[in-house]
Design a protein with these regions (language model features):
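Histidine-/acidic-rich catalytic cores in large beta-rich domains
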Residues: 1-118
Length: 118
């Protein structure tokens, strides 16, 4: 479904209905992966969509069509620990495929612009 080049030169891939997120090196080696379920949690991976690399090196992952018992978005560390979850099934249902979390200069710029709107 989606892929992005990471700061370290690897590629992070959201597999859509493949129920996984995979980091692949330029040499085509899998260096990080979550598949089916986040280890040590009850979070099931469904239709994996958008991806974002945070400034701290963590990943934010979209988990569309996950149903009411799983988050639609979550942040995960390289140690595969969930930092936070967004689970608002009542609000977005299974339709939250893409999103963007703003931080740093980008967040400041958008915040400044929003303050000028009336």
């Amino acid at each position: 479904y989606g892929a992005m080049r990471l700061k370290n030169g690897n590629t992070l891939i959201a597999s859509g209905s493949g129920n996984s997120v995979v980091e692949v090196s330029p040499e085509k080696k899998v260096v990080w992966e979550i598949k089916g379920k986040v280890p040590g949690t009850e979070v099931n991976l469904k239709w994996m969509t958008c991806l974002q690399e945070r400034e701290n090196g963590n990943f934010i992952v979209g988990n569309c069509h996950a149903g009411p018992d799983n988050p639609q978005i979550f942040e995960i560390t390289r140690d595969k620990k969930i930092v936070w979850e967004f689970n608002e099934f009542e609000l977005v249902g299974n339709g939250l495929a893409c999103w963007q979390v703003l931080e740093g200069e980008q967040a400041a710029m958008v915040s400044k612009k929003l303050k000028t709107l009336k």
